[in-house]
Amino acid sequence: MAILVNKDTKVVVQGITGKEGSFHAKQCKEYGTQVVAGVTPGKGGMEVEGIPVFNTVKEAVKETGANCSLIFVPAPFAADAIVEALDAGIELVVCITEGIPVKDMMMVKDYMLKNYPNAKLVGPNCPGVITPGEAKVGIMPGHIFKRGKIGIVSRSGTLTYEAAYQLTKYGLGQSTAVGIGGDPVHGLTHRDVIEMFNKDPETEAILMIGEIGGTEEEEAAEYIEKEVDKPVFAYIAGITAPPGKRMGHAGAIIMGGKGTAKAKMEALEKAGAYVIENPAKIGETVAKILKVIELEEEERTSDAE
């Protein structure tokens, strides 16, 4: 089952005639994703990598039945592109674009809440979503992911890749990996995605990768403590980050003593998550702990018999 995307997902790429849009549309298509349309105003009637281009998302949806949008529109116009996708009936919007003004994203979030409360936005400033072997909607290198039972949710693109590579190396595949993005105002949160994984029968364990800034990891910890009965592993980047200095992502900043890696790690440990302190040990730690859990379950089963 996985979450968010699968082999039936039909993708429209907004900004497909640009350099990044055309390159990644081709990569997604080659992975096996149904990339059914592209959109660039004024370029309707063209084809990019055999994908028909339309002037509007509405037109693309009408002609192809697209239900997911992948956005590569420049930052000044990206908020309008998200709104256009929502207005066209798109259920899942994945926005890769970095550098969208905070006020633009606040407008988008407000617009979604009022008009499309059931629609889902991943990003912006994210690597996208991949369900290994079924669909890739984003910019991640597909070959490092393997079908399996661990759900990944992360604020960092490159740490997502590192974690997936390590898990795959230890024979642990992924159900779905979701890069939620590193901007301060964005769509789906850690908590949202963990809730989806918790309800997904194909996901048996969850790996969350957070970083300094904001309180989303703490909010996820509250949900984990109350609702999640699957093993949750967590890595928080930025242990040595100084207060007030932005660390890579726009949202990765400690302000007013809040958003520290230490506070997030403590909240997650209290919630029962397995907190990993070294990013090089993610795969090894997950593999070891899952093996212990498996052995404990086998012992309980044999005792019951």
From Swiss-Prot:
Provide a GO CC annotation, any one.
succinate-CoA ligase complex (ADP-forming)
Q: Catalysed reaction per UniProt? A: succinate + ATP + CoA = succinyl-CoA + ADP + phosphate; GTP + succinate + CoA = succinyl-CoA + GDP + phosphate
Pathway assignment: Carbohydrate metabolism; tricarboxylic acid cycle; succinate from succinyl-CoA (ligase route): step 1/1
**Active-site residues annotated for this sequence:** 249 (tele-phosphohistidine intermediate)
Keyword field: Ligase, Nucleotide-binding, Tricarboxylic acid cycle
Q: Which top EC class is given?
A: ligase
Instruction: Give its E.C. classification number.
Output: 6.2.1.5
Q: Which InterPro entries does this one have?
A: Cit_synth/succinyl-CoA_lig_AS, Citrt_syn/SCS-alpha_CS, CoA-bd, CoA_lig_alpha, NAD(P)-bd_dom_sf, SUCC_ACL_C, Succinyl-CoA_synth-like
Q: Which GO terms describe its biological process?
A: tricarboxylic acid cycle
Q: Where does substrate bind?
A: 161
Q: Name one GO molecular function term.
A: nucleotide binding
Q: Does the keyword Ligase apply?
A: yes
Q: Binding of CoA: at which residues?
A: 17-20, 43, 96-98
NCBIfam families assigned: PRK05678.1 (NF004230), sucCoAalpha (TIGR01019)
Listed under subunit, the entry gives: Heterotetramer of two alpha and two beta subunits.
Q: What does this chain do?
A: Succinyl-CoA synthetase functions in the citric acid cycle (TCA), coupling the hydrolysis of succinyl-CoA to the synthesis of either ATP or GTP and thus represents the only step of substrate-level phosphorylation in the TCA. The alpha subunit of the enzyme binds the substrates coenzyme A and phosphate, while succinate binding and nucleotide specificity is provided by the beta subunit.
Q: Which family does it belong to?
A: Belongs to the succinate/malate CoA ligase alpha subunit family.
Q: What is this protein called?
A: Succinate--CoA ligase [ADP-forming] subunit alpha
The protein's organism comes out as Aquifex aeolicus (strain VF5)
The gene from which this protein is expressed is sucD
